[in-house]
UniProtKB/Swiss-Prot annotation:
Residues 197-211 have a biased composition (Basic residues). Residues 288-472 form the DH domain. The modification Phosphoserine is found at S6, S41, S111, S212, S231, S234. Keywords: Cytoplasm, Guanine-nucleotide releasing factor, Phosphoprotein, SH3 domain. The PDZ-binding motif mediates interaction with TAX1BP3. One of its GO terms (biological process) is cell chemotaxis. It comes from Mus musculus (Mouse). The keyword Metal-binding does not apply. Interacts with ELMO2, EPHA2, RAC1 and RHOG; mediates activation of RAC1 by EPHA2. Interacts with TAX1BP3 (via PDZ domain). A motif (PDZ-binding motif) lies at residues 711-713. Residues 212-227 have a biased composition (Basic and acidic residues). Residues 505-624 form the PH domain. This is Rho guanine nucleotide exchange factor 16. It is found in: Cytoplasm.
Length: 713
């Protein structure tokens, strides 16, 4: 114990020696002659107080055994230093740090004395060991912080720095302190903060694009446009500079996927905007309009960057091309080069307007022109989606060489650890997000009639394009599906039904258990089954013969079909017993006018509550079309957290950040209406989070109604 105490005392003495040399003090504690404008002596003590000058010679370094007696404590307000007058003050160099952008670069110089002092402060106060390491040189003296941790560390470091003088060391280690503090110049090599403070100008960057949004290109899959949010109709706008770290949002706004990163720069953070001084005179609404314009530009750049990765890493890969046929390669990548060319032209037009004006007058004319005359490759690409998804699934399931090569490509740093499918669906994502971004621009121009009219026309043009993309995708899928089923259905002795029709499409298909009186008490595995094909206008009941052949038993127009869920207490058949555990989820289908003009009743059972709910919902398609939804504002809403691809006809494909009105919930599945286009379908509950903010819910409904009216979707 004594040895430890002795070592501690020796460390303190050595520390005093080094610090004495740092301040260039003589034996009496006075500054060395030659320092200008120093009026009186200064001798720091271990307790941060001061005593009058002494003339005794400098003592030799004390040994651990030779301890000085404790000195009296003098209050700082009564010390001679506090009573002395002067125009200059000597402070440790380690505290003379001007405001600068903080950096984690290890290249910053830290004096030996400052490093020892910080360690000494931590040794004297064990509580500091739990705090994160820090450098005195990296402390921003002008930064305002409300955290107790950083403020306490600053106070601790100052007390440690003013600990007191000791015997000086060699001259080579001394540091000359001038009477005037010089501000440190900002380092050009420091990377800019992603979200600098509003009043802090981060100018003078020597980067590839001089602080441009091109400095740090992000994959489109990783960003979330702020204009997609629907709770920004008030002055509390999400286009304001983010106040939190990347990936976080304010409370009580729409839920945002944590993996998303907002765009790295906002318009008001651009160096040219800061240098122009326009922010001092610009109104809040105009600044928000500029942010909306700039976000369309930056998000298009990220989208174009991701498309270039798809082309260079996947499309142009010789190894990947060698694993498939030319037809499969075409179905997989379609006309992606044409889509990329259209995006390149669109971005160049936006960038040219951005470079010409610090405050962009308008981009509505660019949006409308490209939507009408240059974005037609999107329609062809979206129409090919059904072949693309089928080809990718086939290659992934049956082609080992394709799987191996694809896995190696996806591991490359350029792909960001993302699968190829996330790149293939980018055109569909971008074209469906453009109306929402343009709608945000409309909201920001409501105070300017001419700009609002131009933005509304651009919104109509883009919405018309999206509608054509959706119709193209549905038409190709439905046409191929109808022709395939027409060859697979065998009507046999049943009156033939002309199946092929341009206005007919499949709503749902699947196998169900058929309940008979003789089979009520049988096990599920031994019960007979039937296979249903439900179209938007007719129900076809078949018996499955093979994977590609079905024998038609009966059919009826959907207007003549009724469905009813059977409760546990109800008998399955007239005069029969109540529901058995072997028949878990039964329901009844009545054909009021079948293929022979007679009434027929069918008792069916599914293997899950969600499957039964989905069949009942599909069979009541006609009724729901007529009834509609009266008050959508009362419906719960969810935001999709990860993309979901429909696997059955009654399911809906969703993208990240899609808003969905929940119409029904059953056994882990949700049936909802997609906000952006009104399409309905089922999807797993685990792919979305509930929106709990009432303000966000009401904003979503208002935006949906406005989009439906202005775009006639």
């Amino acid at each position: 114990m004594s040895q430890r105490h002795s070592d501690s005392s020796l460390d303190e003495k050595l520390l005093e020696y080094r610090f004495h040399a740092e301040l260039r003090l003589d034996a009496n504690g006075n500054p060395i002659p030659g320092l200008p404008m120093v009026r009186s002596s200064l001798k720091a003590r271990a307790n941060a107080a001061f005593e009058p000058d002494a003339s005794e010679p400098l003592p030799p370094p004390p040994s651990p055994e030779d301890e000085e007696p404790p000195r009296p404590i003098v209050l700082s307000t009564q010390s001679p230093a506090a009573l002395k007058m002067g125009t200059q003050q000597l402070i440790p160099k380690s505290l003379a740090v001007a405001s600068k952008a903080k950096t984690k670069s290890p290249a910053r110089h830290q004096s030996f004395g400052a490093a020892v002092l910080s360690k000494e402060a931590a040794r004297r106060n064990p509580q500091l060991f739990s705090a994160p390491s820090f450098s005195l040189d990296d402390m921003d003296m002008d930064m305002v912080t409300t955290g107790n941790l950083r403020r306490n560390l600053r106070n601790q470091s100052y007390r440690a720095a003013m600990k007191g003088p000791g015997p000086p060391s060699s001259k080579g280690d001394s540091v000359q302190l001038g009477p005037k503090l010089q501000a440190l110049a900002e380092e050009a090599a420091q990377p800019p903060s992603r979200y600098p403070a509003k009043n802090k100008k981060t100018l003078g960057r020597k980067r590839a694009h001089k602080g441009s949004f091109k400095d740090d290109p992000q994959l489109y899959q990783e960003i979330r446009e702020r204009g997609l949010n629907t709770s920004h109709e008030s002055d509390d706008d999400i286009l304001d500079e983010p106040s939190g770290p990347v990936g976080t949002q304010r409370a009580d706004t729409t839920i945002v996927v944590k993996s998303y990163r907002p765009a790295q720069l906002t318009w008001s953070q651009l160096p040219e905007v800061l240098e122009s001084g326009v922010l001092d005179t610009l109104s809040t609404e105009e600044r928000k309009r500029q942010e909306a314009i700039f976000e369309i530009l930056t998000s298009e750049f990220s989208y174009l960057h991701s498309l270039s990765i798809l082309v260079t890493e996947f499309l142009q890969s010789r190894e990947l091309r060698a694993t498939m046929t030319q037809t499969e390669h075409h179905h997989l990548f379609s006309n992606i080069l044409d889509v990329m060319s259209a995006s390149q032209k669109f971005f160049e037009a936006l960038e040219q307007r951005h470079k010409a004006q610090v405050c962009v007058e308008d981009i509505s004319d660019i949006l409308e022109d490209h939507a009408q005359h240059h974005f037609h490759p999107y329609i062809a690409y979206c129409s090919n989606e059904v072949y693309q998804q089928r080809t990718l699934q086939k290659l992934s399931n049956s082609n080992a060489a394709f799987r191996d090569v694809l896995k190696e490509i996806e591991k490359r740093p350029a792909c960001g650890g993302l699968p190829m499918i996330s790149f293939l669906i980018l055109p569909m994502q971008r074209v469906t997000r453009l109306p929402l971004l343009t709608d945000t621009l409309c909201l920001k121009t409501q105070g300017h009639p001419e700009r609002y009219k131009a933005a509304s026309q651009a919104l109509k043009a883009i919405s018309k394009l999206v509608k054509q993309c959706n119709e193209g995708a549905h038409k190709m899928e439905r046409t191929e599906q109808i022709y395939t089923l027409n060859m697979q259905l065998d009507f046999g002795k049943v009156k033939s039904l002309p199946l092929i029709s341009a206005s007919r499409w499949l709503l749902k298909r699947g196998e169900l258990f058929l309940l008979e009186e003789s089979s009520i008490f049988r096990k599920i595995a031994s019960r007979p089954t039937c296979y249903l094909f439900l179209f938007n206008d007719v129900l076809v009941v078949t018996k499955k013969k093979s994977e590609e052949s079905y024998l038609v038993q009966d059919y009826a127009q959907l207007d003549h079909v009724q469905v009813r869920k059977l409760e546990p207490s109800e008998p399955l058949l007239p005069g029969g017993s109540s529901r058995s555990s072997s028949v878990p989820y039964p329901f009844q289908v009545n054909l009021l006018h079948n293929s022979e003009g007679r009434q027929e009743q069918i008792l069916l059972s599914s293997d899950s509550a969600s499957d039964r709910a989905r069949w009942i919902t599909a069979l009541t398609y006609k009724e729901r079309q007529w009834q509609g939804i009266t008050n959508k504002g009362e419906l719960p809403q969810v935001e999709v957290t990860k993309a979901y691809f429909a696997k059955q006809a009654d399911e809906i494909t969703l993208q990240q950040a899609d808003i969905v009105l929940v119409l029904q919930e059953e056994d882990g599945w949700l049936h909802g209406e997609r906000l952006r286009d009104g399409e309905t379908g089922w999807f797993p509950e685990s792919f979305a989070h509930s929106i709990t903010s009432r303000v966000a819910v009401e904003g979503n409904v208002r935006r949906m109604e406005r989009l439906r009216v202005e775009t006639d979707v």
